Regions:
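Beta-lactamase-like hydrolase cores
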Residues: 1-38
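Short, contiguous, pocket-lining structural segments
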Residues: 13, 43, 128-136, 153-160, ...
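Glycine/charged-rich beta-loop-alpha catalytic/anionic-binding loops adjacent to active sites
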Residues: 28-38, 70-71, 119-124, 175-182
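Active-site SXXK
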Residues: 44-61
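Phosphate-handling active-site elements
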Residues: 60-68
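Inter-helical turn/loop segments and adjacent helix faces that build the functional surface
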Residues: 62, 147-155, 178, 203-207
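Active-site-adjacent helix/loop patches that line small-molecule binding or acyl-intermediate pockets
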Residues: 67-174
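Active-site-proximal alpha-helical segments within enzyme catalytic domains
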Residues: 189-207
Length: 207
C-alpha cells in the first residue's frame, strides 16, 4: 500500500501525493515500507554526502584547509541565509575562484527573511543563494586540487564526476550507475529506495 501525503487549505484537502518509502535498520535490513521499496528513483540532494567524498578523495580538505562549516555546506542543501551565503563566498575565495564558476544557477533563498529582503530591495538572487552552491563549491575545490579544469566540472565525463560515479560503484557494488541531470546541472544518481540506506551503512558512526 502506498503512503499518501495530504495538504489542506482550511478543512479541505487541496493536494494529495502518493509516495513509496523504505525504512532500514543500521545493517540495511528492511523494517518498514510503504509502496514499492524496490522503486528506482533519483537520489538528487540526498546524494550530496556521497558527492562530498571528492573533498577527501582528492585531499582538497587539507589542501585548502577547509573548515567543518565548509564541509557541512558541501553535504547539505542550504537555505540561502546570510550566514550560508557568506560561508560559500569565503569557500570560493579560499579556492581562488569567483561565483561565476558555479554551474548551479540562481534562485531565491529558501530562508523567508532573506527572500523577502531581496524582493524588498529589488535585488536579484545570485549563484551563492542556490541551495546547491556549497556542493558545487566542493566539486570546484576537488577539481582545483586534482589539477583539472574548473570549467565543465558539472559534466558527466569530468574527472570530478567520474570520481563520484566510482564512489557510487564502490558503495553499491554495481558497475552501471544510471543517472539523469539534476536541476543544478550535475549528474543525479538513480538508486533503489532500499539500496540507498544499505549504501549509507558503511559510513554510520556507532556509539
Amino acid at each position: 500500500m502506498s503512503a499518501h501525503i495530504y495538504s489542506y487549505r482550511g478543512e479541505l484537502i487541496e493536494n494529495r501525493h502518493t509516495a513509496s518509502l523504505a525504512i532500514a535498520n543500521p545493517s540495511g535490513k528492511l523494517i518498514a515500507y510503504a509502496g514499492n521499496p524496490e522503486l528506482a528513483a533519483h537520489l538528487r540532494s540526498s546524494s550530496k554526502p556521497f558527492q562530498a567524498q571528492v573533498l577527501f578523495q582528492t585531499n582538497a580538505v587539507k589542501h585548502f584547509g577547509l573548515t567543518p562549516k565548509e564541509i557541512a555546506v558541501t553535504c547539505a542543501s542550504h537555505s540561502g541565509s546570510p550566514d550560508h551565503v557568506a560561508t560559500v563566498g569565503s569557500y570560493l575565495k579560499k579556492i581562488g575562484l569567483g561565483p561565476e564558476y558555479l554551474a548551479c544557477g540562481a534562485h531565491l533563498p529558501f530562508d523567508k527573511e532573506s527572500m523577502w529582503l531581496l524582493k524588498e530591495t529589488r535585488q536579484e538572487p545570485t549563484f551563492l543563494h542556490s541551495n546547491c552552491s556549497g556542493k558545487h563549491s566542493g566539486m570546484l575545490a576537488a577539481a582545483m586540487t586534482m589539477g583539472a579544469t574548473p570549467r565543465g566540472y558539472e559534466q558527466p565525463d569530468h574527472p570530478v564526476q567520474q570520481l563520484n560515479f566510482q564512489t557510487m560503484r564502490d558503495l553499491s557494488g554495481a558497475q552501471n550507475i544510471p543517472y539523469g541531470i539534476d536541476g543544478c546541472s550535475v549528474p543525479a544518481f538513480v538508486r533503489r529506495l532500499l539500496g540507498a540506506p544499505r549504501e549509507v551503512e558503511p559510513w554510520l558512526v556507532r556509539t
